[in-house]
Amino acid sequence: MPVTGRRVVSMGVILGFVLSVICAPPPAAAAQGGVVHTSTPRIIIDTDLSLWWDDATAIGMANVLAQRGQLHILGIVSDIRNPHAVAAIDAIDTAYGHPNIPLGAVAHSEANTAPHGYTSDLIHKLPHSVHSSENVSGAVVLYRQLLAGQPDHSVTIVAIGAYTNLAGLLRSKADRHSSLDGRALIRAKVKRLVIEDGLFPGSAPALTNQKLDLVSAREVISGAGWPTPIAWVDGSTGLQTKVGGALCTTVRSTNPMRIVYESRFGCGPPGDGDWDGPTLLYAVGGSQQFFTELGQGGAAFLNAAGGLSWSTDPSRPHDVYVHVANQPALNERIDALLGAR
């Protein structure tokens, strides 16, 4: 049966058609209130939010920037096999006043093989209308629906997790949302793919995001690969991005960033860096003072160990990898966004 919007429609053909119109994801402007200007970054976040706290920070920061009209969240797709991850994402979005952001779940998320981490805390402490992956569209279906409705070359995909949904989008066929196959749809609608991964320019072993789905990683990175420019915000960006230390004393107990921080670190100093927050900031632009772009004329490739390396590649002239240029300023900016409501 058709899957549209944030709900799975499972009734008859006629009723299903009616509901597909009524329950379709709200237009981009309606989801966050207001007209989307052509200059406003339009993003789709692809996340493995479940255990690592920095996925939550990226989504929280995106919501704050959306409140300020500095970006527009078209949708968020989960790429982790935790059926309740989308409920936690919905809890974050709802806490920031954006309960209607379209959500999608990776195929077979009901397998429930991923640790739940702090997702249970968010679900138990904050209101939300999505309860599991059964309540939302499939990630690839939602990708296609969202991309089809956007102007050409206007969407930035912020990939801060596994490659499963990206590979699925590449493989996807024409459907009722678009007559284009996945590769052609990406080429038409996506401006750039921003990925948190790698340790460039040297060679690295397989890191978390590759290990989650190495087959899909190869599909996105190798061979014909991804048909738009890719910016890689590599692992070095997060090592010294120690943020969130003041949340327990500066924001209310219902602040979703505080809930995540307390769950992971118990109000002590951050026990981990933050990789996904910098990736989100870089992806939406206007933060050149924090980052430097390197590696022009090259591209990432998967080495024999399943990790990423950088090499000259004339076929991908617009790919870059990104390092931090001003760590204190970056940390200050992220802390300010984490503490905002």
Segment roles from a protein language model:
Residues 1-31:
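Secretory targeting and sorting signals
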Residues 32-341:
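N-terminal acidic, glycine/proline-rich low-complexity segments
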